[in-house]
Amino acid sequence: MPTQLHPVPAPDADPPVLVAGGPFTAVELQAMEHDGVLRRLIAGAYVPVQCREAPELRARGLASILAPRLVHRTVVGRLTAAWVYGCAGTPDVPVLLVDGSRRISTLRASHRLLVHEVYFGPFDVVELAGVKVTSPLRTAVDLAIHSEDGVSVPVLRRMLAQPRLGLTVGLVARGLDALPRQPHLARARRVVARVAGAPAS
């Protein structure tokens, strides 16, 4: 069962996330963005301009543009998870992960997103506002392995700078050491060494 991260207290509890069709059209939402009333959170999801962003709000925003079955069957991962945690830019194409025991062909058909088949450990998934997201540690390990150095290094540094995420360079390194052998593991260790500001061993 996903772990529940402790929410960050916010002055505006559960600000609305608005998408086309309820109760405004896409044109009306864009007009309110132009007027400075709303700001775009991700794709077609908008929030009041004065509300403070938090991981829970970004998770809700992402869920609002996905079909409910995707929200229930997938886990937000990689750079999209880093965005949820406030450590990466807004993704143009959300990255979703699905457990290797599930079928993913039907998830790829009609959505502008990337779906990867992976395997999860018992502590790899947390829940934010009802949305499953890879844990900070799993996210950091995935970024070190799967993202280009120029992308992963600054994002990992931002993640390590957030005390709430509970990450250290040593913890990420141990996460990599716990993985079975795979093609990009040596490069991932070099990425973590760069983040630590030390030469790779």
Regions found by a protein language model. Give the residues of each.
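Short gly/ser-rich loop at a beta-strand->alpha-helix junction or flexible surface loop bordering the NTP-binding
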Residues: M1-S201
